[in-house]
């Protein structure tokens, strides 16, 4: 297997939202229930060449790590129970070199395992800071095993048809 070279050329917050709808009326002393949803998207950037074109051996991709966190509490005074909702789309611009030598599966693994693994600590820090600024303890998300997530999504997509996004 050829060694793939994946480089990051930039990273940034594409979207960030924090909702604290029941403040200052939230009085629950219990820890909220935390629901985390993760979605990964990869988009080939315009102006980069396809794998089949021989004069180009690398391609550029924007990888988006979309994380949505919803914290709920059981509090009679709060009708919907929402403590907060935090959502971020954290992106990186990556290039993959040696493209002609890589299989399609190796490229997908770089995009949906390597890219998100690099981006996650930065997105995690942003979520911790935003929840802290919202008046809650900093939310430190547990590490995510993107390889296992990739494998699980691959199994689901084989039965449902293919897609370039992973949830």
Curated annotation (Swiss-Prot):
Gene Ontology MF term list: unfolded protein binding
Pfam family, one: SecB
InterPro entries cross-referenced by the UniProt entry: SecB, SecB-like_sf
The entry's keywords: Chaperone, Cytoplasm, Protein transport, Translocation, Transport
Subcellular location: Cytoplasm
Gene3D superfamilies tied to this protein: SecB-like
An annotated GO cellular component: cytoplasm
Purpose of the protein: One of the proteins required for the normal export of preproteins out of the cell cytoplasm. It is a molecular chaperone that binds to a subset of precursor proteins, maintaining them in a translocation-competent state. It also specifically binds to its receptor SecA.
Assembly information from the UniProt record: Homotetramer, a dimer of dimers. One homotetramer interacts with 1 SecA dimer.
Name listed for the protein in its UniProt record: Protein-export protein SecB
């Amino acid at each position: 297997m050829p060694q793939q070279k994946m480089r990051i050329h930039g990273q940034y917050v594409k979207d960030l939202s924090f909702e604290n709808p029941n403040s200052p009326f939230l009085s629950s002393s219990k820890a909220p229930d935390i629901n985390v949803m993760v979605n990964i998207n990869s988009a080939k950037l315009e102006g980069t060449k396809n794998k089949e074109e021989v004069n180009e051996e690398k391609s550029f991709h924007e990888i988006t790590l979309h994380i949505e966190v919803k914290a709920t509490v059981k509090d009679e005074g709060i009708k919907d129970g929402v403590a907060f909702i935090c959502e971020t789309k954290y992106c990186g611009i990556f290039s993959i070199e040696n493209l002609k030598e890589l299989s399609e599966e190796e490229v997908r693994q770089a995009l949906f395992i390597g890219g998100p693994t690099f981006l996650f600590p930065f997105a995690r820090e942003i979520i911790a800071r935003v929840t802290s600024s919202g008046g809650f303890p900093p939310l430190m998300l547990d590490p995510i095993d993107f390889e296992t997530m990739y494998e699980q999504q691959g199994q689901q997509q084989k039965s449902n048809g293919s897609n370039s996004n992973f949830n």
